[in-house]
């Protein structure tokens, strides 16, 4: 009875305290929309010693901005107040900074959860309420945190299936050979819990792809974990919270381990005797389970030689070739607690050479969407062909009922023969790497059997399926889109259906090519070519949350760097990336136009997100690489290096190299000029005054040398250009053209496009990125529209009309060929679509206040476009611009996030006609401080504006 009275009193007290807190809520127009740590919501496995806090505020009214913030961090929720916060109390900090605010509290401990919240004040000193409590959990901060966890690998390869082998044949081999690769490994162990668990965290580092099981169920929705890396220098672990999934008493843990890129020891060998083994070693895994009990005690359970191991039904797996699954060798319910594993062996401890293990911070690869057959028909050999209607990256899943031992083989391909009668063999991936894209399933013969792969993904639209007794349908076979789960955060739509379709194809081509790295293609190579990566980076940033993705890829580039001799001074050594990162297929040192990705990716991350940490972190490497490229300077002041404007129309490096109109040295030096300016900015940010001055001088010298060497008159005209469309576009984009020559150069570009090329582009990836933006900037927007929408080769509309659903690598006249050549899914050709946001939408981040703290609004569009709607993600919230154009008037609805301002670009005539929210600019300026003038441009504070002016 006394206990009940005490409990009732405590409940009353709790209700009273809660009511008091509710009464203390402020009436405020400042509301938190998002509260993030390291750009994530409630993240686990944080390894930063000084995490970064950010928040997005929704606020009513106009011209609202932050004047101060207050952050609390505590070790528990009950300490998360101003009096008891025991980890960090920032107190009130006078600052407008609301993104990437650096933690300055006590040292954070490994594998520990912390709680935090924030409040802000606006410039009128209006105070917000505290945000809802958030948490973050630290990861394993150094090797000692792994405790006794050992690396384990398969002891015995016991595969006996005759289907463990595949054919491998490169172009240098007369006959194929049989290969099998490393076996997929199955590991299990049990743990008995006799106390109540308060928190349970599992940390798994797979060298090779893995899947994790607990008590008969797969844990999480990740596939193909973890992301690829330079495994000898950097590997990634994944953290799982399994507190709610553990049972009292016995629990069974299971791991299936595949080769991934770590154990890929087949593809990219020149011949059977080649020593180009791209594997790092046999796949291996490390597991640590950290348990905290409700009585306050802790314990660990980890991988070691006591774990049991076996092979199983996955009898072959290769990231390029595919999986082979022999269902006759299934292991039963091997992840359950009551499974008899007495026939299994014991795992072998191993010690792979790895310098660093970190938490995987990028989004995981997941199964994103299923696709049903759109058409099913028989090929010329009588086998069934399935068309899924969309070129995707992923795999197929099967649901079949056939006799025991029946082999079902699925060959995936991007294209049919031009006559449509069969799949095109040249589009199955094997021509490049020696392994055709094939999935194999061998039936156990006991009724309906369902299966999908685990350790490979392909690029395909079509599938030829052999070995089935009935016509395939949606119940039998589906395609599964599998990719890194980058979140789509931006949007674009306009009045032109062709542009909308181009935008969708560009997005598709990117999504298909993110699997822990920005790939060149999802089938033939699966490589992170640096030139491809920077070609489509900005368009990706307009559409997706790529913050962590590109930070991870920068680490891939850094860990891929090799000591390289200087060109002019071979006695000097520089750390230089290779053309490809990460992995053992490196190509050569990164030529200038590819290697500038090392500077561009941090620049874009800074420009679009405003986080200067990546600039500071990679500054030494960027500085060293800049000096390496300066060591190519010739007597004429031009760097004698370059890869070239990849894949212009009709170009083939072996049979038609002349089709590359732009000299590789010219396009490389144009990029390098831009990068010298970026490095000047980076030097200033890093208080490196000497290098800042050096970069300024080198940039000015290169501009002079570039114009002297490459700016020429076009015969029989009054115009000039830089000897190709690409170089001319680059020179205009990067500000290399002398002021007095701009009009002549623009006219020269137009002349070549219209009079010489018949209204077509002749650009590869370097020129494609900027040509439509540049034409729009210099008053030739209608010409940009013409190039894009003409139905004739080589326009984007021609490609779409040819039936492609992603952008092909090469620009050829497809109807004249037996079948499409090379890859049909290359995101380097998506880069031009940044034009839809920066020109049509008119939204660009300011270089003066990065991360869209200030941004430019300046729609530049062709007369054929009458309406455009864009949403651009920023660290402050979404910028939205919805405009329509009719009878010379531009009507715009513009939404500007809290704590930012927009620079509306106008000429004097446009300014004089300007009406904002129904008022002339002059009247509005008298009554509000949220609108100011800067030349003829108008600076707008936050809020939603209705804008109308005569567009000239």
Swiss-Prot record:
<feature type="binding site">
    <location>
        <begin position="524"/>
        <end position="525"/>
    </location>
    <ligand>
        <name>alpha-L-rhamnose</name>
    </ligand>
</feature>
<keyword id="KW-0449">Lipoprotein</keyword>
<dbReference type="InterPro" id="IPR035398">
    <property type="entry name" value="Bac_rhamnosid_C"/>
</dbReference>
<dbReference type="InterPro" id="IPR008928">
    <property type="entry name" value="6-hairpin_glycosidase_sf"/>
</dbReference>
<dbReference type="InterPro" id="IPR013737">
    <property type="entry name" value="Bac_rhamnosid_N"/>
</dbReference>
<dbReference type="InterPro" id="IPR054970">
    <property type="entry name" value="Rhamnosidase_Flavobac"/>
</dbReference>
<keyword id="KW-0378">Hydrolase</keyword>
<dbReference type="Pfam" id="PF17389">
    <property type="entry name" value="Bac_rhamnosid6H"/>
</dbReference>
<comment type="function">
    <text>Alpha-L-rhamnosidase that may be involved in ulvan degradation. Ulvan is the main polysaccharide component of the Ulvales (green seaweed) cell wall. It is composed of disaccharide building blocks comprising 3-sulfated rhamnose (Rha3S) linked to D-glucuronic acid (GlcA), L-iduronic acid (IduA), or D-xylose (Xyl).</text>
</comment>
<protein>
    <recommendedName>
        <fullName>Alpha-L-rhamnosidase</fullName>
        <ecNumber>3.2.1.40</ecNumber>
    </recommendedName>
</protein>
<dbReference type="InterPro" id="IPR013783">
    <property type="entry name" value="Ig-like_fold"/>
</dbReference>
<feature type="binding site">
    <location>
        <position position="532"/>
    </location>
    <ligand>
        <name>alpha-L-rhamnose</name>
    </ligand>
</feature>
<dbReference type="Pfam" id="PF17390">
    <property type="entry name" value="Bac_rhamnosid_C"/>
</dbReference>
<dbReference type="GO" id="GO:0030596">
    <property type="term" value="F:alpha-L-rhamnosidase activity"/>
</dbReference>
<feature type="active site" description="Proton donor">
    <location>
        <position position="525"/>
    </location>
</feature>
<keyword id="KW-0732">Signal</keyword>
<feature type="binding site">
    <location>
        <position position="520"/>
    </location>
    <ligand>
        <name>alpha-L-rhamnose</name>
    </ligand>
</feature>
<feature type="signal peptide">
    <location>
        <begin position="1"/>
        <end position="21"/>
    </location>
</feature>
<dbReference type="Pfam" id="PF05592">
    <property type="entry name" value="Bac_rhamnosid"/>
</dbReference>
<dbReference type="InterPro" id="IPR035396">
    <property type="entry name" value="Bac_rhamnosid6H"/>
</dbReference>
<keyword id="KW-1003">Cell membrane</keyword>
<feature type="binding site">
    <location>
        <position position="594"/>
    </location>
    <ligand>
        <name>alpha-L-rhamnose</name>
    </ligand>
</feature>
<feature type="binding site">
    <location>
        <position position="826"/>
    </location>
    <ligand>
        <name>alpha-L-rhamnose</name>
    </ligand>
</feature>
<dbReference type="InterPro" id="IPR016007">
    <property type="entry name" value="Alpha_rhamnosid"/>
</dbReference>
<dbReference type="GO" id="GO:0005975">
    <property type="term" value="P:carbohydrate metabolic process"/>
</dbReference>
<dbReference type="InterPro" id="IPR008902">
    <property type="entry name" value="Rhamnosid_concanavalin"/>
</dbReference>
<feature type="active site" description="Proton acceptor">
    <location>
        <position position="809"/>
    </location>
</feature>
<keyword id="KW-0326">Glycosidase</keyword>
<dbReference type="GO" id="GO:0005886">
    <property type="term" value="C:plasma membrane"/>
</dbReference>
<keyword id="KW-0472">Membrane</keyword>
<dbReference type="Pfam" id="PF08531">
    <property type="entry name" value="Bac_rhamnosid_N"/>
</dbReference>
<comment type="similarity">
    <text>Belongs to the glycosyl hydrolase 78 family.</text>
</comment>
<dbReference type="InterPro" id="IPR012341">
    <property type="entry name" value="6hp_glycosidase-like_sf"/>
</dbReference>
């Amino acid at each position: 009875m006394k206990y009940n009275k005490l409990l009732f009193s405590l409940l009353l007290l709790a209700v009273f305290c809660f009511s008091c807190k509710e009464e203390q809520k402020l009436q405020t127009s400042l509301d938190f929309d998002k509260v993030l740590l390291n750009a994530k919501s409630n993240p686990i496995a944080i390894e930063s010693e000084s995490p970064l806090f950010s928040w997005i505020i929704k606020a009513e009214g106009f011209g609202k901005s932050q004047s101060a913030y207050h952050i609390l961090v505590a070790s528990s929720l009950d300490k998360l107040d101003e009096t008891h916060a025991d980890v960090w109390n920032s107190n009130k900090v006078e600052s407008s900074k609301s993104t990437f605010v650096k933690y300055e509290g006590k040292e954070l401990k490994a594998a520990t959860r912390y709680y935090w919240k924030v409040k802000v004040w606006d410039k009128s000193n209006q105070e917000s309420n505290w945000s809802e409590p958030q948490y973050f959990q630290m990861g394993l901060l150094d090797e000692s945190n792994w405790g006794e966890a050992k690396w384990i690998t398969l002891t015995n390869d016991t595969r006996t299936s005759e289907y463990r082998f595949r054919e491998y044949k490169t172009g240098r081999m007369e006959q194929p050979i049989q290969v099998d690769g490393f076996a997929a490994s199955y590991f299990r162990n049990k743990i008995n819990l006799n106390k109540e668990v308060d928190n349970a965290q599992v940390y798994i580092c797979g060298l090779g792809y893995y899947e994790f099981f607990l008590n008969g169920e797969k844990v999480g929705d990740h596939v193909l974990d973890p992301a690829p890396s330079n495994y000898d220098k950097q590997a990634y672990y994944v953290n799982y919270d399994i507190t709610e999934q553990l049972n009292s008493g016995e629990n069974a843990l299971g791991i299936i381990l595949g080769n991934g890129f770590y154990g890929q020891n087949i593809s990219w060998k020149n011949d059977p005797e080649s020593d180009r083994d791209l594997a790092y070693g046999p796949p291996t895994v490390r597991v640590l389970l950290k348990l905290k009990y409700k009585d306050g005690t802790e314990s660990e359970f980890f991988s070691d030689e006591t774990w049991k191991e076996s092979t199983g039904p996955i009898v072959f797996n290769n990231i390029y070739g595919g999986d082979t699954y022999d269902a006759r060798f299934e292991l039963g319910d091997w992840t359950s607690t009551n499974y008899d594993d007495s026939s299994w062996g014991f795992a072998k401890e191993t010690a792979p050479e790895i310098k660093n293990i970190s938490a995987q911070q990028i989004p995981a690869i997941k199964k994103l969407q299923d696709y049903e057959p759109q058409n099913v028909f028989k090929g010329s050999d009588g086998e069934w062909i399935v068309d899924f209607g969309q070129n995707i990256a992923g795999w197929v899943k099967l649901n079949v009922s056939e006799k025991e031992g029946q082999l079902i083989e699925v060959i995936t391909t991007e294209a049919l023969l031009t006559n449509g009668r069969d799949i095109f063999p040249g589009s199955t991936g094997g021509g490049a790497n020696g392994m055709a894209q094939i999935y194999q399933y061998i039936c156990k013969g006991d009724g309906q059997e369902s299966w999908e792969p685990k350790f490979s993904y392909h690029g395909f639209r079509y599938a030829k399926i052999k070995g089935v007794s009935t016509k395939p349908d949606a119940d039998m076979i589906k395609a599964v889109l599998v990719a890194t789960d980058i979140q789509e955060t931006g949007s674009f739509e306009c009045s032109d259906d062709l542009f909308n379709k181009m935008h969708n194809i560009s997005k598709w081509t990117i999504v298909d090519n993110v699997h822990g790295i920005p790939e060149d293609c999802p089938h033939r190579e699966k490589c992170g070519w640096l030139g491809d990566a920077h070609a489509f980076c900005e368009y990706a940033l307009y559409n997706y949350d790529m913050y962590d993705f590109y930070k991870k890829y920068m680490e891939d580039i850094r860990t891929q760097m090799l000591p390289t001799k200087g060109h002019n001074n071979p006695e000097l050594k520089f750390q230089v990336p290779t053309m490809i990162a990460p992995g053992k297929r490196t190509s050569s040192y990164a030529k200038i136009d590819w290697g500038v990705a090392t500077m561009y990716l941090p620049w874009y991350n800074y420009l679009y997100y405003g986080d200067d940490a990546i600039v500071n972190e990679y500054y030494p490497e960027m500085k060293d690489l800049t000096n390496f490229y300066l060591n190519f300077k010739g007597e004429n002041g031009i760097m004698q290096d370059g890869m070239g404007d990849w894949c212009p129309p009709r170009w083939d490096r072996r049979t038609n190299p002349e089709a590359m109109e732009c000299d590789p040295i010219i396009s490389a030096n144009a990029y390098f000029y831009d990068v010298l300016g970026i490095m000047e900015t980076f030097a200033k940010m890093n208080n490196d005054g000497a290098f800042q001055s050096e970069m300024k001088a080198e940039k000015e010298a290169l501009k002079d040398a570039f114009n002297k060497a490459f700016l020429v008159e076009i015969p029989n005209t009054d115009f000039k250009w830089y000897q190709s469309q690409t170089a001319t576009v680059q020179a205009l984009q990067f500000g290399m053209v002398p002021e007095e020559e701009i009009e002549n150069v623009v006219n020269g570009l137009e002349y070549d496009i219209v009079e010489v090329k018949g209204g077509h582009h002749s650009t590869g990836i370097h020129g494609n990125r900027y040509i439509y933006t540049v034409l729009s900037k210099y008053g030739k927007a209608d010409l940009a529209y013409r190039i894009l929408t003409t139905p004739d080769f080589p326009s984007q509309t021609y490609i779409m009309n040819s039936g492609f659903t992603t952008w092909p690598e090469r620009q050829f006249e497809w109807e004249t060929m037996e079948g499409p050549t090379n890859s049909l899914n290359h995101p380097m050709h998506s880069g031009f679509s940044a034009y839809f946001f920066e020109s049509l939408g008119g939204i660009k981040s300011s270089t003066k206040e990065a991360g869209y703290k200030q941004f430019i609004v300046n729609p530049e569009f062709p007369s054929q476009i009458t309406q455009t709607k864009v949403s651009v993600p920023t660290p402050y919230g979404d910028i939205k611009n919805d405009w329509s154009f009719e009878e010379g008037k531009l009507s715009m609805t513009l939404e500007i996030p809290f704590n930012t301002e927009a620079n509306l670009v106008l000429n004097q005539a446009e300014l004089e006609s300007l009406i904002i929210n129904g008022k002339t600019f002059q009247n509005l300026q008298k009554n509000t401080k949220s609108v100011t003038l800067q030349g003829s441009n108008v600076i707008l504070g936050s809020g939603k504006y209705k804008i109308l002016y005569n567009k000239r």
